[in-house]
Amino acid sequence: MFEPMELTNDAVIKVIGVGGGGGNAVEHMVRERIEGVDFFAVNTDAQALRKTAVGQTIQIGSGITKGLGAGANPEVGRHSAEEDREALRAALEGADMVFIAAGMGGGTGTGAAPVVAEVAKDQGILTVAVVAKPFNFEGKKRMAFAEQGIAELSKHVDSLITIPNDKLLKVLGRGISLLDAFGAANDVLKGAVQGIAELITRPGLMNVDFADVRTVMSEMGYAMMGSGVACGEDRAEEAAEMAISSPLLEDIDLSGARGVLVNITAGFDLRLDEFETVGNTIRAFASDNATVVIGTSLDPDMNDELRVTVVATGIGMDKRPEITLVTNKQSSQRVMDNLYRDHAAGMSSLNQEQKTAAKAVNEQNAQGSKEPDYLDIPAFLRKQAD
């Protein structure tokens, strides 16, 4: 006798914020109510975990730090994560994809994030890390810690995105508040996570499953993520331009990107010519040797809005001779033959251990300095300023 079997095809996506900065980034996404994603905060600081809005928390290294934090010592952060390795493994169990958010240069984020990534990879989980580098005024020692942490983290992730905090001043201007600056950077990570989640879970005209996402995201190396939202007659072009602009990310040559993932989310009013516009806008940034996955998601709540999410992976790796195009369920080679190449965006995190950052930024404001070159700012940011 045959019995009905319940099918569960949804991929499980988890976002782990490690340390003060990573925890703040994840808390930002929780408040934005992203659907289809599980959120966790990992920290040595018991007080920070008690205050967070993230529902699932893991305190690590209580036997080492007594819940008082890592004291800006990455070794303490690493040993703390090792001490509670089993708790981390249990939290990650069942995940298909994990995003790790952390601020580099301090104790917990720098030391524990590589351990979290290693635990995830040991379980065969697709692992992507998004980390922030400290301001230059925080000193050479903290920057050295950050570089060491990033190097160690890169050994255990499929894709790695880095964001120098110094880019916040250059791109957003010296008049912006500290909270607004970090919030803008966190919005980029939120958009990327949201875009991938929607790509997998929402119905669309061109459905993309998790296997397609894994194909792109497993291209080892540095990665870029970007998301843009626009309204009106030119919404497709404007959203695509925002998605491929990555002013807050590390300066990396994207011409060698080996994987490209594109998602277009809109209401039922999405037009064919808008789909083509997105493809043509991004086309100039495409690598000739990229595996490309494209898809659309329909959101009835987006009346006049159109959102484009772009992910480029495998940056800095050797180029492959072949070109692979993946458009699951329907073909769209005419529109997206060689999709993508350039800047997408990441996240930055508000590090609770860096109270001096606000004071230093204000002092620089008082001293005054030249505004960044107008033409150095991406078009969508110039439009907002004008």
Curated annotation (Swiss-Prot):
Residues 350-377 are annotated as: Disordered. GTP binds at residues 20-24, 107-109, 138, 142, 186. The keyword Nucleotide-binding applies. Its main location: cytoplasm. One of its GO terms (molecular function) is GTP binding. InterPro entries: Cell_div_FtsZ, Cell_div_FtsZ_CS, FtsZ/CetZ, FtsZ_C, Tub_FtsZ_C, Tubulin/FtsZ-like_C, Tubulin/FtsZ_2-layer-sand-dom, Tubulin/FtsZ_GTPase_sf. Keywords: Cell cycle, Cell division, Cytoplasm, GTP-binding, Nucleotide-binding, Septation. One of its GO terms (biological process) is FtsZ-dependent cytokinesis. The keyword Nucleotide-binding applies. Pfam families: FtsZ_C, Tubulin. It is found in: Cytoplasm. Belongs to the FtsZ family. This is Cell division protein FtsZ. It comes from Sodalis glossinidius. The gene is ftsZ.
